């Protein structure tokens, strides 16, 4: 027991944490027994590690690049900041230098002024102390010559015997001084143009020349120049009709004439010196207008001294009678009435006696209103080319023509419609309103300022008598014309009724005409000839110049005028029909020849000056088509469309420029095609017509200029404030986009004119007045949508015209063929659901990658309009480009069969010529020839009885579009076209075209409804 315990104790002494040390195993056989790694796996591991390393390197590289860029940007910003600071420093230095230079210049100017002032101060004392006996100035050679001439004339005057009766006005020194005194530079002095001041002249009695020498001073040449400049300024200021006279009095023509005669006889100096220099010779000079001469008469001084009485008593009356005493040949655009100079033998004798009396210097009885005694004189009035003994007759003729001018002025101002009556002879026949307007005006109406003599009372009475007789004749002729108008208007009304009898109308017309000719009095030869000519030409020349009339005061006169205007309205509008309109209505108007209306075409007196179409009494031909359609081809064009251009004026950056239509118009003129066509006067389309397709906001925005826009509601004009209408272009102009430029003043008018030209031309073709037509218009329109302007287009001319024809002229079915290389997205949008209009477009599509991106083959319409929208969308780009073969194949397989099935009443063609060869790829890039366009037009003329209207759309190569326009107009005229090449006729279209056509046929075969 004890031994067991001791053994346990021994075992417990061994350390528990120590392990027995085993020997190192150095055998290699155990390693060979371990599993071997597959080399493929090892390769993959290595590749993964390599990729990981590469990724780490890329990340490190990107980090380095980013760090480099960041540092580079920081350095760049620092460099820019340093440059800005350096520039600021340079600018500051430059400004300081400029300020220093300015200060130096100012200092230099001050020094120069100071030196000049000192120099003048040094020169003044010698001048102030100069002896008065010495000369103060040296006279110029001109002044010396004038002085010598004056002294010679003075000595000649002394040599001639002088008495109280032989003093002429031109040689009286005191009178010369009086006339010269009025050339002072006072504000009330008259200008050099011949108008006289309103104050009166006081002429002192005759004095000896030794006591009153007329020379006031001897002016040197610089003084003359200064005076002439000041006089010219005063003359320019006083000659303005807008400035009132400070004197306050009305200057009569008679007073002006009397002073002008006096002044012209005493002074004829140069314009530079005025009347301050003496006369050139002993005789007076002719006045500015060369209408009168004042010879030295025994009573010249008496005549001048009595001038004040004449002016005071008769100036106002004469002013009210004859407001313009000159230019009898001006007729204000109306034919002058022949003067009556051969009234009777007694009148001739009276004129002869008066002429003899005038030659002797004795005034006629009552010549100056009865205020001049018999001893006064009257200057001889000589006209150019007239002897002195015929002065009275020439003056009489002059006054008669002046009275006619006054009557014509009343006619233009709103008097009697055709033959106004003279207020001199028949004051009781003028309405109170008219009589009130012809009282003495406070401000004289503007007219030519002349110095012809005013008529005298005896001559005025003669004028009154002759004008009264002439007025009676004209009044009878006017009444006859009104009666003939009534009869002819009745005959026209009978023609419109089915049971009208032309023979009865003719007999009634002839009977009334004979009765009026019997009642017409026969007075003078000229009056009778005028009367007969007026009656004979009444039927052929129906119509007269309609002048705006002033409203009459009395109700009775207003009713009479209203009745007469109503009776004449139907008849007066007939001459305004254009020749093409009358030709189209030849079937309806053939019976009018029986009553004298066959001269309607021959006598076209007055053409309309408005841009709107002329109104007609007969029914509109579009409502009831004539039996035979017109045979003419119309051309619509207006120069207003040339003004639509960018303000930069560079046509190279803007392909849609004014040279397009200008070149086409010139080509048509050069080839003579324009002479074979009917020129159609264009007009601006109304906003209501534009709103047939476009929204009200769009039509107001692009259809009005800034002047018109001020009158519109700004809320309608601006619309959505968030919408941006115009933007600045790189060239400096404005535009809707980078291509569609906008001119604030002219673009709206040009766009409306383009629409109006197409409407006018299509209306005349639809009504039968024209066979077909071509509208040479710009800007184009087939890209313009309801509220969007794009692609050079603002208003869709063809779409608006189509709706106008359908709504206004009842054209039920219209075919629109778009030949432009770009798709007409605006036209498609306007008629996408409309079954009355078939739209066919041939355009480059390229799967939507060509502008405007629309026009896919599967866009066939919607609703009732499904199948009435056909897009011949070419694909495949320009490898190869489409040409004549492809377009002819499209017409043969799709356009012609579908159009014949549709059977349109009218064909509108969007004639875009940018598919022609010569256009760059961005603008088209196709290779269609101009000859092909002519043949395509000829094929379209087989539809709708030939009623085809082409409207220019795109096309920017000038030579190409001119050739195509010439070919199309030749086709419209029916001329022989240049044949296409044989290889084109027998060639097959390219594969891209075949694929496109097959796809279109497949799609349309399922959607066409009218087949």
Curated annotation (Swiss-Prot):
MF-aspect GO terms: DNA-binding transcription factor binding; histone deacetylase activity; histone deacetylase binding; histone H3K14 deacetylase activity, hydrolytic mechanism; histone H3K9 deacetylase activity, hydrolytic mechanism; histone H4K16 deacetylase activity, hydrolytic mechanism; metal ion binding; protein kinase C binding
SUPFAM superfamilies per UniProt: Arginase/deacetylase (SSF52768)
CDD domains for the chain: ClassIIa_HDAC9_Gln-rich-N, HDAC9
Enzyme Commission number: 3.5.1.98
Region ranges (Interaction with ETV6): 218-261
Protein location: Nucleus
Region feature Disordered, mapped onto this chain: 110-139, 183-249, 262-304, 494-536
Primary enzyme class: hydrolase
PTM comment text: Phosphorylated on Ser-240; which impairs nuclear accumulation. Phosphorylated by the PKC kinases PKN1 and PKN2, impairing nuclear import.
Region annotation (Interaction with CTBP1) ranges: 23-27
PTM-bearing positions, type Phosphoserine: 22, 220, 240, 451, 554
Compositionally biased intervals (Low complexity): 262-285
Family according to the record: Belongs to the histone deacetylase family. HD type 2 subfamily.
Quaternary structure and partners: Homodimer. Interacts with CTBP1. The phosphorylated form interacts with 14-3-3. Interacts with HDAC1 and HDAC3, and probably with HDAC4 and HDAC5. Interacts with MEF2, MAPK10, ETV6, NCOR1 and BCL6. Interacts with FOXP3 in the absence of T-cell stimulation.
Disease: Auriculocondylar syndrome 4: An autosomal dominant form of auriculocondylar syndrome, a craniofacial malformation syndrome characterized by variable mandibular anomalies, including mild to severe micrognathia, temporomandibular joint ankylosis, cleft palate, and a characteristic ear malformation that consists of separation of the lobule from the external ear, giving the appearance of a question mark (question-mark ear). Other frequently described features include prominent cheeks, cupped and posteriorly rotated ears, preauricular tags, and microstomia.
Task performed by this protein: Responsible for the deacetylation of lysine residues on the N-terminal part of the core histones (H2A, H2B, H3 and H4). Histone deacetylation gives a tag for epigenetic repression and plays an important role in transcriptional regulation, cell cycle progression and developmental events. Represses MEF2-dependent transcription. Isoform 3 lacks active site residues and therefore is catalytically inactive. Represses MEF2-dependent transcription by recruiting HDAC1 and/or HDAC3. Seems to inhibit skeletal myogenesis and to be involved in heart development. Protects neurons from apoptosis, both by inhibiting JUN phosphorylation by MAPK10 and by repressing JUN transcription via HDAC1 recruitment to JUN promoter.
Name of the featured protein: Histone deacetylase 9
Gene transcribed to yield this protein: HDAC9
